[in-house]
Regions:
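Short helices/loops that flank or line small-molecule/ion binding pockets
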Residues: 66-78, 96, 142-143, 161-167, ...
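Long, aromatic- and glycine/proline-rich binding clefts that accommodate carbohydrate-like moieties
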Residues: 117-118, 274-277, 326-378, 385, ...
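Periplasmic solute-binding protein
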Residues: 91-98, 114-151, 178-202, 284-285, ...
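Conserved N-terminal structural module of periplasmic/extracytoplasmic solute-binding proteins
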Residues: 3-91, 104-109, 150, 281-286, ...
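Extracytoplasmic/periplasmic substrate-recognition and gating elements
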Residues: 49-50, 122, 145-146, 217, ...
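Hinge/lid segment of periplasmic solute-binding proteins
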Residues: 86-134, 144, 159-162, 169, ...
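Ligand-binding clamshell of periplasmic/extracellular solute-binding protein-like
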Residues: 31-36, 57-116, 128-137, 151-159, ...
Length: 411
């Protein structure tokens, strides 16, 4: 097995990573992940002491991991025994047979709803370690200044609140959302349609026209009434999200990481004003929300599969999820651990964070497709054109739908 792609924690290549074969104790494995997923030296030492398995870490930029895995696999080589698996890569990795299926108990599946995202044809391909799902946030003081005393329950409530915020001069562009030509813009349309109607795609993989058109029309209204900021159309999605921390936006549906961001005085100028709430729906609060988690999986080309699986089990255990929250700021994917951290006050001002975690479910009826990246590109480009006034909602839908249907026909 070639490890030429690795620059491990020790900064050295090794030919020993393939030793300690199947079913044996001890040995050495390699782990490739972004910086935020790398365990501490003490944590790795504890794992080695417990199992006899040494772990060589390769800290790789998130954007480069997928390419490194693909490059190695094309030469029938293993980039690393255990690898980062983003939710959006699952379909591609499954189609290419790059991941070894994992055995997961029903108890763990119940405790980690985001496992569904990494499950294809009843096979669990990776175990989620970092929880991200869509949660809503609103600035209670700004809402009150505009005469709004109730928390928004529906998307219509949010729209009317944003109109009031603008009309009263409280906030000029109160709705923060990604509209640039990037991935976050695609997922914004996905979660909006999903929380509105519980569906984004039909069973055959095509868009559910009624649901997606309703979401696009909602976005078009926000754009036309200038309830979103002009800069949201061209700046990064994260910059758009961060407007709520700067006080230039009053409402956001975004990452769970904002539970911490809205309390950090170095990042947020309106600390104490923003509350995490259940995401709105069509007739009341949404019955489901979209997960966007990160996971780790075992390479199908690994020569150390059993040792690698042992590492995955350890890394995603309840105890390690607590440790990784402390050392790496990872939001637990186990609801039992999330609840414990909230109850003991480790995670503060959590609002509806735990309640929302319990309604996480995947919007993909047949799992994430292998053509996800191409589909997402078609989506965010069409939405961005709509934001810039080049397309209306109907035209944006037609462009997206035509591209998706073409991808499906090529399958």
């Amino acid at each position: 097995m070639s490890l030429s792609l690795l620059a491990g924690c020790g900064g050295q290549e090794t030919e020993e990573a393939g030793e300690g074969g199947e079913g044996e104790g001890g040995g050495k494995i390699t782990f490739m992940a972004p910086d935020w997923a790398i365990p501490t030296e003490d944590q790795l030492a504890a794992f080695t002491e417990e199992t006899g398995i040494e772990v060589e870490c390769s800290e790789v930029g998130w954007d480069d991991i997928r390419e490194k895995i693909a490059t190695a696999a094309s030469a029938n080589e293993c980039a690393a025994d255990v690898v980062e698996v983003d939710w959006s890569w699952v379909g591609e990795f499954y189609a290419a047979d790059w991941l070894e299926p994992l055995e997961v108990s029903e108890e763990d599946k119940a405790d980690m709803p985001t496992i569904e995202t990494f499950t294809v044809d009843d096979q669990v391909l990776a175990m989620p370690y970092a929880n991200d799902y869509r949660l809503s946030y609103y600035n209670t003081e700004q809402f009150a200044a505009a005469g709004i005393t109730e928390e928004p329950q529906t998307w219509d409530d949010v729209l009317e609140a944003c109109r009031a915020l603008k009309e009263t001069g409280t906030v000029e562009h109160p709705f923060a959302i990604a509209l640039n030509a990037e991935e976050k813009t695609s997922t914004c349309l996905m979660w909006l349609a999903y929380t509105m109607n519980g569906v984004v795609w039909n069973e055959d993989g095509t868009f559910n026209e009624e649901s997606v058109m309703e979401a696009l029309t909602y976005l078009e209204t926000l754009i036309n009434e200038e309830l979103v900021a002009p800069e949201d159309k061209t700046s990064s999605g994260m910059d758009a999200y961060m407007r709520i921390c700067g006080g230039t936006a009053s409402f956001l549906t975004g990452p769970t990481s904002f539970v911490s961001r809205i309390q950090d005085e170095e990042l947020c100028s309106v600390v104490g004003q923003i509350v995490p709430i259940m995401t709105p729906g069509k007739d009341g609060k949404a019955q489901q929300t979209m997960p966007l988690p990160e996971a780790i999986g075992v390479s199908s080309l690994s020569e150390n599969k059993e040792a690698a699986k042992t590492f995955v089990e350890w890394y995603t255990s309840a105890d390690m999820q607590k440790q990784l929250n402390e050392t790496n700021s990872a939001i637990p994917t186990r609801n039992s651990v999330l609840e414990e951290l909230i109850d003991e006050g480790t995670i503060k001002n959590s609002g509806a964070m735990l309640e929302e975690a319990k309604i996480v479910s995947s919007p993909f009826p047949n799992g994430i497709p292998s053509y996800y990246a191409e589909m997402s590109s078609a989506m965010y480009n069409a939405i961005n054109k709509m934001a810039l006034g080049e397309l209306n909602a109907e035209e944006a839908y037609a462009e997206m739908s035509e591209a998706l249907n073409g991808l499906i026909s090529e399958e």
